[in-house]
Amino acid sequence: MSEIEKRNHGDCNILYKEIKKREQKLVNMKKEGFSFPNSFKKNTTSRKIYQKYQTKNRNELISLNIEVSIAGRMVQRRIMGKASFFTLQDIEGKIQIYINEKKISSDFYRFHFKKWDIGDILGVIGTLFKTKTGELSIYCKNVTILNKSLKPLPDKFHGLSNQEIRYRKRYLDLISNNKLYSIFKNRSNIITAIRNFMIENDFLEVETPMLQNIPGGANARPFITYHNEIDSQMYLRIAPELYLKKLIIGGFERIFELNRNFRNEGVSARHNPEFTMMEAYIAYSNYEDMMELTENLFKSITKFLFQDNKIIFNNNNFDFSQPFRRLTMTDSILEFNSTITSSDLKDFYKIREFAKSIGIKVEKKWGCGQIETEIFEKTVEKKLIQPTFITQYPVEVSPLARRNDINLNITDRFELFIGGYEIGNGFSELNDVEDQKTRFLNQIQKSNKEDNKNLFYDKEYIEALKYGLPPTSGLGIGIDRLIMILTNQISIRDVILFPTLRPFKK
């Protein structure tokens, strides 16, 4: 056995003994009448205490005689004979508690409190005071154990160093990393800000099916399930788009949905199979109207969250009060690729050779539009740091977008990029039923065998289009990526409480 194996074996043995010791303590507690208290009436949090009383001096706190009731997890303890200091951690921070046997009785202190462990959940009632070093603390009058931690917490100095364990055991990550709470609090605030903005702009929030007969609205591999009662294969939705446009056909004019989508595809720092998206549609408008709305939405979110429009993400400064840059896909490729010309992008043989020269595997059924999009994704996308709308996407890669009036080979479509990430996608919606029918069929015909399994001809949507879809613009925003940028996190797993992981294997 190597030294590392010996050390690991020794660590496991120590952990096993510690767990058994704690389990026996719980057995003893139950014999003494512990029955898992049903509640504890707390009246404050650690953060509120600091916010309100940190500026008070020792004498002021004595004269005020402020009694507080607080609950949380004991994460540190320093026993000094007949008195102890311990740290209580709640969701908003930590606060120091002072306890001595004179205040709570000698027997309780010696035979109960001193036998409790780090990680135990406690309820504390006491008065505020400041120590000689000026630390705001609570002088404990009464302390109750609310639940026993049967396993020791991660090392307080190193926390959880294994990334996968952090994601798999998020509860431990939250206990050992106080900063994590602020990320997910901001996530909630961002979603609130989006909803507030949409409602203030006269949008109605709607809900469309998660279980669908045909997974439409995007080209992605779906999750497949089965409905026993109706004896039918069904799919978790990959996008709500086609249902939302049916509502526009039905007479709704300004709608949005903020919910989950599911795509049975890769997991990475940028992708999670289960993700949150906001889609919005405005009748009697075009993609330029939607770009303007998108800019205003981002201004509103950052102002709500930070009281300012300036943020930092991945060491880059952003100012969302400034107009977003607008660039066509063709112009963006020319800007970042000095060896190709505008005429080359229109010549099938030249654009194909250029794509091959930069490592793109060109498929036989691809036209210029698909190849141009692949070049853009490989050479441009990650270089778009400041907020940029890329417009004029080829028809070939935009089956649901309206053709441009001047150039029928491109669409009135945009994608928003920030920090090298695609954050949003929007366009003037295609409402020509014959064109839509043809594009659906062409998409299936040109796809490879693997993609073909994921493409469906949606007869119900074509039927709905026959009743007339008014001029409409649509928008989709990836909420998880947006939250990454606004909270300065470089992995999507750090903004999802329980990201998708492979099954644990011992």
From Swiss-Prot:
Mg(2+) 1 binds at residues 415, 422. Binds 3 Mg(2+) ions per subunit. Its EC number is 6.1.1.6. It catalyses: tRNA(Lys) + L-lysine + ATP = L-lysyl-tRNA(Lys) + AMP + diphosphate. Keywords: Aminoacyl-tRNA synthetase, ATP-binding, Cytoplasm, Ligase, Magnesium, Metal-binding, Nucleotide-binding, Protein biosynthesis. Its main location: cytoplasm. It is found in: Cytoplasm. One of its GO terms (cellular component) is cytosol. InterPro entries: Aa-tRNA-synt_II, aa-tRNA-synth_II, aa-tRNA-synth_II/BPL/LPL, Lys-tRNA-ligase_II, Lys-tRNA-ligase_II_N, Lys-tRNA-synth_II_C, NA-bd_OB-fold, NA-bd_OB_tRNA. Its cofactor is Mg(2+). PROSITE patterns: AA_TRNA_LIGASE_II. Belongs to the class-II aminoacyl-tRNA synthetase family. NCBIfam families: lysS_bact, PRK00484.1. This is Lysine--tRNA ligase. It comes from Buchnera aphidicola subsp. Acyrthosiphon pisum (strain APS) (Acyrthosiphon pisum symbiotic bacterium). The gene is lysS.
